């Protein structure tokens, strides 16, 4: 079915699963908790292994429940295909390894989640020989100056976590494409409220663990392929030339515009094995069904909390994508048309010790290392999520010693504010 004629919410409820499962008529997507699938005959098995016919062989590389999730997120993003993997970190890693190898370079914005920064700064280089150059992405000129003949991709986060900066996607996409490389965007914190493919992105990655799942129950990642990038421009021979590990297949010739995502599945997922479990896929499918409703409430609550914090005597500063002091405010207003996200950061007067006292005084808000839960969450990034970074590296990613990060939930906003207020007051007590 052509899902492009349907609205976002209709696709979120129906795409990838129509008509209802033939054998039973199940309206809900069934959980196919199986490792493998019976072939009809020897010829059928041979065709599947030769990639001559779509179908399922082994759950490590494909599963009917997981496939529904992949088709649904591809429909929502209006891409040609998607791959579900075991975590957001796996999604980011595969997205890079699919097109880069030893000696290649990636140009990345510096406003990154701490786990991504560590992956790029240390693990990718030490294990794969891939060099990541970090630049201040708030000025597109920095991106262009960092690109060389060895560059294989430009990487951005939609809203830097926790710096909350928003890049000029269209300007950066133009630069990347002029140099013959794709733009990869991590849209984890902005599903529904930002559509990366509409603004020049070629590949989108998600930690589905966050807002897509929405309830803090499951770990998973997603890679979505726009199908618009020209992989035949001479910079990506692995997508064009025969793959000796898979019968000499040329991904571009065989899969056309879906070459990137097909290679990611048949090569990386097959060999590295970070597959998503069918049960987690089922939970993410449920999450997609209410994603837009939750994101609207997250954003609505966040705006009210920003206003509360701005006037609180125990707060020294507040940051949000459209805050007056945020240097990329105009980009947020330009690109984020359905809301400005659920992440709010602020400083508690009294610095690190006062911040610790604030965290320990919360009663309703949960202190934990996650974002995107339906419940409101709080953390002190400098001592937790970004602890492995040096103080200089923390500052480059937007983390200050006094920073508190809130992931605003969908509770009654008055209750969230009441908990913030009492904890802030206690943080100032001698």
Swiss-Prot record:
List of residues that carry N6-(pyridoxal phosphate)lysine: 210
Reaction(s) the record says it catalyses: O-acetyl-L-homoserine + hydrogen sulfide = L-homocysteine + acetate
Listed PROSITE patterns: CYS_MET_METAB_PP
CDD domains, per database record: CGS_like
EC number(s) recorded for this UniProt protein: 2.5.1.-
One Pfam family recorded for the sequence: Cys_Met_Meta_PP
Keyword Nuclease part of the UniProt annotation: no
Gene3D superfamilies associated with the record: Aspartate Aminotransferase, domain 1, Type I PLP-dependent aspartate aminotransferase-like (Major domain)
Domain of life the protein comes from: Bacteria
Biological or metabolic pathway of the protein: Amino-acid biosynthesis; L-methionine biosynthesis via de novo pathway; L-homocysteine from O-acetyl-L-homoserine: step 1/1
Keyword terms: Amino-acid biosynthesis, Methionine biosynthesis, Pyridoxal phosphate, Transferase
Biological process according to GO: L-homocysteine biosynthetic process; transsulfuration
Enzyme class: transferase
The UniProt record lists the keyword Amino-acid biosynthesis: yes
SUPFAM superfamilies assigned: PLP-dependent transferases (SSF53383)
Required cofactor names: pyridoxal 5'-phosphate
GO molecular function terms noted in the UniProt entry: cysteine synthase activity; O-acetylhomoserine sulfhydrylase activity; pyridoxal phosphate binding
InterPro entries membership: Cys/Met-Metab_PyrdxlP-dep_enz, Cys_met_metab_PP, OAc-hSer/O-AcSer_sulfhydrylase, PyrdxlP-dep_Trfase, PyrdxlP-dep_Trfase_major, PyrdxlP-dep_Trfase_small
Family label: Belongs to the trans-sulfuration enzymes family.
Function of the protein: Catalyzes the production of homocysteine from O-acetylhomoserine (OAH) and hydrogen sulfide (H2S), a step in the methionine biosynthesis pathway. Is not able to form cystathionine from O-acetylhomoserine and L-cysteine.
Protein known as: O-acetyl-L-homoserine sulfhydrylase
Organism name: Thermotoga maritima (strain ATCC 43589 / DSM 3109 / JCM 10099 / NBRC 100826 / MSB8)
